[in-house]
């Protein structure tokens, strides 16, 4: 299922570009800068006039974490554009009876349906530290249950269970056959059950969480799992001072204008609408390196990337997914940004200064990738509050009411 976005309505609202610019600028302000640059700031941001191509892969209920985020915000209310990254909550242990589990097992047959297209997906993960309970090699035989990573929010989150007998440093590639327009029991859908081939095995744990999170769900709440392919003209302008620290510190300070363009993204993302707010998060990347990207062949194509170099091992378990033994310290398990271009404006200077410009460009590209991963890759997300405009309209008196107020005076 595909649909068109009225991108013009989105770009016509200058407050969206301004909010995103301020959000990105705050993230850059929190970065520790190297000794050769200073005063980094974002001066302009534009989403551009070319919309992304979006294909719906799944429609269902919003993840419980989005409701949990609303409860955490309390009466203060969300910002226009806010982020939940690196949020910490108190962990609580719960137990469920075997009888309840047995009663709910009958509902698992409807958890997901499949679609015909076959696309290889990279594992989704947050850049926070993984907690390893065991160090062992991948087990032989049938495919093991894909690992569930412990995130910073709470160990009870749907994708944060610690596996008891499997090392957590095995990443998995899934094919898109696991994502369909099927129906799952209300409130049981999680990134794990949607993208995980062994969702039936882990759905019982998800139900425990769902039954414990008593949240008020609106009748209009909806969530879309979509494939997003973007190669538009979004651009970001930055300014930074290039420092020459010889023969003394800050001997020369030269402002440089940097233009970031040509951003390419091809990923699976979740878009949820609930209680007049839109939640957005990337779940995983799509690997386009194989020539039969949209074929329905059952053969598994394996490709490695610089982000997670490893020796792949394929298990025959009725689906195409690959185990990668990755460095646990490697943070680039989801890139989101596949391609990016940066240009700099600088006057004619000595060669040693020009060499530092290349270092600045490389540093900023790496930091921008890190910001996007840490703020937009699950289990982090951004929330866009859509209720502010409605509140302003309610507070603005109508012409008739203003006239009546004047007459009463």
Curated annotation (Swiss-Prot):
It is found in: Mitochondrion outer membrane; Endoplasmic reticulum membrane. Residues 137-147 have a biased composition (Pro residues). Keywords: Endoplasmic reticulum, Lipid transport, Lipid-binding, Membrane, Mitochondrion, Mitochondrion outer membrane, Transport. Residues 64-106, 126-151, 388-409 are annotated as: Disordered. InterPro entries: Mdm12 (IPR027532), SMP_LBD (IPR031468). Residues 81-96, 396-409 have a biased composition (Polar residues). Residues 1-387 form the SMP-LTD domain. One of its GO terms (biological process) is mitochondrion-endoplasmic reticulum membrane tethering. Its main location: mitochondrion. GO terms for cellular component: endoplasmic reticulum membrane; ERMES complex. GO terms for molecular function: lipid binding. The keyword Ribosomal protein does not apply. It is a peripheral membrane protein. PROSITE patterns: SMP. Residues 64-73, 97-106 have a biased composition (Acidic residues). PANTHER family: MITOCHONDRIAL DISTRIBUTION AND MORPHOLOGY PROTEIN 12. Component of the ERMES/MDM complex, which serves as a molecular tether to connect the endoplasmic reticulum (ER) and mitochondria. Components of this complex are involved in the control of mitochondrial shape and protein biogenesis, and function in nonvesicular lipid trafficking between the ER and mitochondria. MDM12 is required for the interaction of the ER-resident membrane protein MMM1 and the outer mitochondrial membrane-resident beta-barrel protein MDM10. Belongs to the MDM12 family. Component of the ER-mitochondria encounter structure (ERMES) or MDM complex, composed of MMM1, MDM10, MDM12 and MDM34. A MMM1 homodimer associates with one molecule of MDM12 on each side in a pairwise head-to-tail manner, and the SMP-LTD domains of MMM1 and MDM12 generate a continuous hydrophobic tunnel for phospholipid trafficking. The SMP-LTD domain is a barrel-like domain that can bind various types of glycerophospholipids in its interior and mediate their transfer between two adjacent bilayers. This is Mitochondrial distribution and morphology protein 12.
